[in-house]
Curated annotation (Swiss-Prot):
Keywords annotated in UniProt: Chloroplast, DNA-directed RNA polymerase, Nucleotidyltransferase, Plastid, Transcription, Transferase
Name under which the protein is recorded: DNA-directed RNA polymerase subunit beta
Subcellular location: Plastid, Chloroplast
GO cellular component terms, semicolon-separated: chloroplast; DNA-directed RNA polymerase complex; mitochondrion
Protein's GO biological process: DNA-templated transcription
Enzyme Commission numbers on file: 2.7.7.6
Subunit structure, as described in the record: In plastids the minimal PEP RNA polymerase catalytic core is composed of four subunits: alpha, beta, beta', and beta''. When a (nuclear-encoded) sigma factor is associated with the core the holoenzyme is formed, which can initiate transcription.
Pfam families: RNA_pol_Rpb2_2 (PF04561), RNA_pol_Rpb2_3 (PF04565), RNA_pol_Rpb2_6 (PF00562), RNA_pol_Rpb2_7 (PF04560)
SUPFAM superfamilies: beta and beta-prime subunits of DNA dependent RNA-polymerase (SSF64484)
Domain of life: Eukaryota
HAMAP family in UniProt: RNApol_bact_RpoB
InterPro entries assigned: DNA-dir_RNA_pol_bsu_ext_1_sf, DNA-dir_RNA_pol_su2, DNA-dir_RNAP_su2_dom, DNA-dir_RNAP_su2_hyb_sf, RNA_pol_bsu_bac, RNA_pol_bsu_CS, RNA_pol_Rpb2_2, RNA_pol_Rpb2_2_sf
Amino acid sequence: MLEGGNEEISTIPGFNQIQFEGFCRFIDQGLTEELYKFPKIEDTDQEIEFQLFVETYQLVEPLIKERDAVYESLTYSSELYVSAGLIWKTSRDMQEQTIFIGNIPLMNSLGTSIVNGIYRIVINQILQSPGIYYRSELDHNGISVYTGTIISDWGGRLELEIDRKARIWARVSRKQKISILVLLSAMGLNLREILENVCYPEIFLSFLKDKEKKKIKSKENAILEFYQQFACVGGDPVFSESLCKELQKKFFQQRCELGRIGRRNMNRRLNLDIPQNTTFLLPRDILAAADHLIGMKFGMGILDDMNHLKNKRIRSVADLLQDQFGLALVRLENMVRGTMCGAIRHKLIPTPQNLVTSTTLTTTYESFFGLHPLSQVLDRTNPLTQIVHGRKASYLGPGGLTGRTASFRIRDIHPSHYGRICPIDTSEGINVGLIGSLAIHARIGHWGSLESPFYEISERSKKVRMLYLSPSIDEYYMVAAGNSLALNRGSQEEQVVPARYRQEFLTIEWEQVHLRSIFPFQYFSIGASLIPFIEHNDANRALMSSNMQRQAVPLSRSEKCIVGTGLECQVALDSGVPTIAEHQGKIIYTDTEKIILSGNRDTLSIPLVIYQRSNKNTCMHQKPQVSRGKCIKKGQILADGAATVGGELALGKNVLVAYMPWEGYNSEDAVLINERLVYEDIYTSFHIRKYEIHTHVTSHGPERITNEIPHLEAHLLRNLDKNGIVMLGSWVETGDILVGKLTPQMAKESSYAPEDRLLRAILGIQISISKETCLKLPIGGRGRVIDVRWIQKKGGSSYNPETIRVYISQKREIKVGDKVAGRHGNKGIVSKILPRQDMPYLQDGRPVDMVFNPLGVPSRMNVGQIFECSLGLAGGLLDRHYRIAPFDERYEQEASRKLVFSELYEASKQTANPWVFEPEYPGKSRIFDGRTGDPFEQPVIIGKPYILKLIHQVDDKIHGRCSGHYALVTQQPLRGRAKQGGQRVGEMEVWALEGFGVAHILQEMLTYKSDHIRARQEVLGTTMVGGPIPKPEDAPESFRLLVRELRSLALELNHFLVSEKNFQINRKDV
């Protein structure tokens, strides 16, 4: 619990709460809503009727545990049973049975689902809310054109447009538009009813000409005219029932279904009182919308801001799962209808169980979790990543925007995001501003809006009430800005305070304030809230930092940060990584695999996670933190997980850093590090890789797993057991065989030995040979085998292949090429590992651990790292930890600097080291060159910031190519490490080489090493035997390709070779 401004206390909501609430809403409401929509199904003769009895549906507890589902690659789901009845109308008999409809994947305690053994998460989508929106645009003459856009629940649009002559049109597509009178007549109104129900009948009459009167003479004429314009049909179509059905399906169903939220928005915007259960667009809505549009034309009314959050709705996990359930029931209905007709045709007696199959629902959900863009594999790099992933809000996805077409205005920060969507945390690149992160206190309301909490300020009552307000409500209140949190009640009443009102910032007296913020972190996401001194950083660097914290690798020895923000504990607890006691008791046994807890007359065995692989190959491992015989309370930490210490998030290490140049080794964001970080395993992490192989039944027989592999060296097979699978605990190197496998294949007739041909001719014996298809360890995969899983197929089906998975653990120390970063967007690549005796050292003899470039601070404006650096030094010397809320300047001016200097001064006094705080240059110190022992000319900032090691590691990226595959068309090497590709020499690289005058290297890169087919073959031979490299005389393949392309355009192109001896031009065809 964290204190607000005065005596009130506010709790931070659970970070997974949005996912839990969404799933519970689906189970409690969504399921029954969709089941009630399931219709009664009759056969063609209307003799039998099938129906579901929704009241008695039940979800069964899963048969397997979460851990087993992950281990065996199964889905953690619940079976759904519903009562169904089959009624014979002639005899009025009814047969009722409880039928199994299918499996619904359940949500676990992390807010994720396990589908086929993979953790998947459904992220929230931000969509335009259904309803009507008015806006104006300038036409080519510079005149404002006013439009009203009706957006349906399906995302379809119907635009009403008023032109210069005050005529109102309904635009059914980008090119086609019809008169609004035709649309209203097609919906069933006559001219008298239209004119009686509008505010401006004279405007409607003004564009009613003879031609229009003919079109709206009858409903049939209007429907025909509307159909002609909508479907772009020529000629004279004839009115029919099928034409009406097509129009209903293609237009009215897609563009006029408002839904529950759309009806509410329509009623509010147009001041209507149509019942909430009327979710279809009525003629009355269009008449009211047209009246409003005419008012807009003549300067009455307010245009809508399409980017305001009150005009958006959140499509949560509940809505997406409900949509999929409805889709599955539609498919089930069609299947039941077909099965029923088939049974009657073949004179069989159907039963409810025979009519319903469970595959429809199960496959619908499996395809949704596997293929839908909003269902993503849970990023499990570290505990912070797991939490943040479920709190994303995306404008992308079905019915949303695309990264290439979204405008800058949509991506930009909007005042209505305050306290709802974080203004900092978003993805970098093409999706910037389109994928955001929810603020800490934000929640999704009943109507799909994002709500933020505020304290209500009341003069009558001294008690402060907390309200959750939607974006459409809070802009009508005076909301005091965050710095009012610091003022006590006595001084508040005397001062004027900054406040927000209708997206503007004002300065008003305290008595006029209606609401105030509840918490300093209220505006930020979790990632941004973990950055200390964030108010001293440029927003772009804070964005990079909140993204890079999610890329931090869990280290083998984690360490708490000296300077933090106070949210580290909650992030760790909500991530589910540490093990927490569910009730009090006494520890009676503990080891690395389990903790046994005794309490309340029962004994509970708590299994621990041991060397488990995350999907980013990081190591998830739990270490017990309690000893045998200790009494514990409910909620106490039993075991720490990856990147947590004492139940707090611990992503990096506090290391001694100096900001100074060092022989150019730290220029341009390079980082110089001490060898101590390698030898003492400061930045050592474990990574677990998974390698798998399948065995299939081929047309020539089944594949075999064996250790008897012909034509392979015994050294490569040394780690295999008698079954042909690598032994647990083996150390394996690149190229070693992990699983021995032989695939049978038929030999060609010519390759048979004479005796084999004789046997085949006499006895008809098919002689087969086997091909070696073993699982080999690829480059960079060396390590220790920690687990082998042989997943056997069930039922002996050839379609379910056996799978063998081998897990190999690697220990990775920090090395040159690894990426490290601070928490302020200060990132760099390790450029050199220096012996500790050569590193710069402090006045007490300690060598520094890292040397950063001081030029990386001023231009990037992330000064927060300097505050953290100096405060970390003081905390390290005083053995203190600091937890600092952002925007501490609200208490007094220069609050951050005063805190840092006072702590440095105290550290200087307590340790009797005057160099820690020198008044001439506070925060800086004279340090010495480790190579010469001389002091550097200028004092240097030294400190202990929190530095992370990121997942971008050189072991995963370093790559070299000798020879490999070539592209078929250009004959140039492929691209990328995975394809054993080459390095592209582009236009600018060629310029650089030209600038240095390296003609021979340039020629080799563009010919021998690239796409000159004959020359590259000759080079290989001369390299093997020695001798001069032959010079190519013909053109490389890319030039020949250009010539072929020009010939396809009927342009003949030849090139000429100039001989060096006589300079005569010899013509040569390409």
